[in-house]
Each structure stands twice: as C-alpha cells, then as structure tokens.
Amino acid sequence: HGAAVLMCEQPRASCSTAGVVYLPLEECLEQADVILTIGGDGTILHEANLSLRYAKPILGINLGRCGFLATCEVSEMEAKLSAVARGEFSVDNRMLLYVRVLGHDGWEGHALNDVVVTKGRLQQAIDFSIYCDDILVEHYRGDGVIVATPTGSTAYSLAAGGPILDSQTKGVV
C-alpha cells in the first residue's frame, strides 16, 4: 500500500524483517501516523501516554487474554492494516484522567484506566482530599481510593464492586 513501516530500535534483535525502518523511539513516534501495539490491553495502557504525548491513535493487535482495548485479533491484522493504510478507520476517543498526587511520594500524569491510591503497608488509615477541576469533592479517611474512567470501570473498580460505565460516558467512578 506504499506505507512505510517504522519500528523502534529496541526489539530489533528479535525482529528482522525486510523493508522495516528501525529508528530511535522518539523519532519513530514523531514520524508515525498510527501507533501499532501487539499484545493485550496492558500493552495499550502502557503506550497510552505516548499516544497522548504525540497525538497519535493506537491500533491494538490482541495477543493477550483480555481484549477490551486491543480489539483487533491476529486473524484480522492484515485486513485492518490495509484499511489503515487506505485511511479507512475511525478513532475511538477515550476519557483520560489528569492526576496529581500530593505528598511524600507525589506523582503527576495521565491515566486511561484508573488511579489507585492506597495506604500501602501502613497500619493506620490515611487522609484523602479529592479535587475535580480544583474544587474539593470530598475529604475522608480510609484505606484508599480508586478513581476510574469509563474505560477503567471494567477493571479494578469493577473488582472492588463499582459499576460498569459505557465507554463514551462523560464521568468517573
């Protein structure tokens, strides 16, 4: 189809395919039109920040056990890649959480699935203040908190008794 295949240099030793251009990861992501992941949902979750940083859609080829996000099966890969090369695809935009955890082990970033903050090995409960758009939502004391996007509502949040949200819902659990 005339599309160039770019691959980051890291897996080069395990993949030697004619016609593939190997580049440093940053350069590969800058030049690519689509990020192709081969694995399962965990692989997509791992690459979601790259997708966000470079404003590139992800096409997930499912090799894992769970394919909620990696919806393309290996048997469909050739047809899907041909469709992408022809520009015949749609992008399913998903909600992301921007998270800032303050305190001793502070963290800042984006989450496609969920954010889980727990007391860890501490024997006592911890205090939480949860803000949304810089507005205090709740302050409480407990073992931890899970905040999940609609995408993440089928993961840890569901296992903890939370509801399943439609992927296009504009809200969090």
Predicted segments, located by residue:
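Catalytic core of DAGKc-family lipid kinases
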Residues: C66-D143
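Gly/Ser-rich helix-loop-strand patches that form or flank binding pockets
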Residues: L50-I61
